[in-house]
Amino acid sequence: MGSVNSRGHKAQVVMLGLDCAGKTTILYKLKGNRLVDTLPTVGFNVEPLEAPGHVSLTLWDIGGQTQLRATWKDYLEGIDLLVYVLDSTDEARLPEAVAELEEVLEDPNMAGVPFLVLANKQEAPDALPLLEIRNRLDLERFQDHCWELRACSALTGQGLQEARQSLLHLLRS
């Protein structure tokens, strides 16, 4: 898709993660800083987002239910960045989330594509600490990708400004 250093660039960003991770809530918080009632996404949501530096983003929020994950690969061709959302409170499903991320990153369309992992729901008292999530994900093994890991809360908005900055940084890398 090209470098984001050029003026007027349009970047395609795909957001994936297991069901109930908070992808749709994050999408609409980033879009208008508003909290919306959500239902499980069947298919996808897509929203434009203007970013500093004359960058227009198109954010694709793809449903994360088990039966929809087989379609994830259909959204990877030509993307500029992957955002992968984890539910920090769902320790039982963390291995499943890691396995799905690995599968996505192994797709040939993902060669060299940077990714941002958002550890969502950090406001919850039972949320796993970011360092523990980092250790379990072992992201350093993905040497063919630029990546960042950020803690956030879609509910409170905590960490979403930093997530947006990371997103733009990765697009420029």
UniProtKB/Swiss-Prot annotation:
Is Transit peptide tagged as a keyword?
Answer: no
One CC-aspect GO term: cytoplasm
Question: Which SMART domains does this one have?
Answer: ARF (SM00177), SAR (SM00178)
Which keywords, in A-to-Z order, does the entry hold? GTP-binding, Lipoprotein, Myristate, Nucleotide-binding
Molecular-function GO terms, alphabetical: GTP binding; GTPase activity
One annotated GO biological process: vesicle-mediated transport
Note the lipidated residues of kind N-myristoyl glycine.
G2
Question: Where on the tree of life does the source sit, at the highest rank?
Answer: Eukaryota
Q: Where is GTP bound in this sequence?
A: 17-24, 61-65, 120-123
Family membership noted in the UniProt record: Belongs to the small GTPase superfamily. Arf family.
Known role: May play a role in apoptosis. May act as a tumor suppressor.
Name of the protein in question? ADP-ribosylation factor-like protein 11
- Designated gene of the protein: Arl11
